[in-house]
Amino acid sequence: MEQFVLMIYQGTTPLPGTPEWEAMPQEEQTRVYADYAAINQTPGLTGGPPLGLPADAHTVVVKDGTTDVREGAHLGTDGAVGGFAVLEAEDLAAAIEVASRIPAARLGGAIEVRPIMEW
């Protein structure tokens, strides 16, 4: 078995409580909740804790010994990580299959599948 981190990039994925979410048909909202519930039941998957909104993030950069703190996500709202999970899977193909079921992948975001390295 191999371990992977699945990083969920929100992109333009509608978030609950936003006007974009409210504009989605109720059927799609229900499907999103059901899909995330099913993903969370995947054997070998450990979901990360919920992350706050990208607008509430602070990005820290140190240059020439000086710490600069910027408001917001490093890559902006569309490039922000919205969540993550650790997955133990047979191989990369199995990890990709799980990632493909995460709703953000079909709703304007993307899922990055990255192997966990052992040092």
Regions found by a protein language model. Give the residues of each.
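Conserved, structured core segments of small domains
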Residues: 1-119
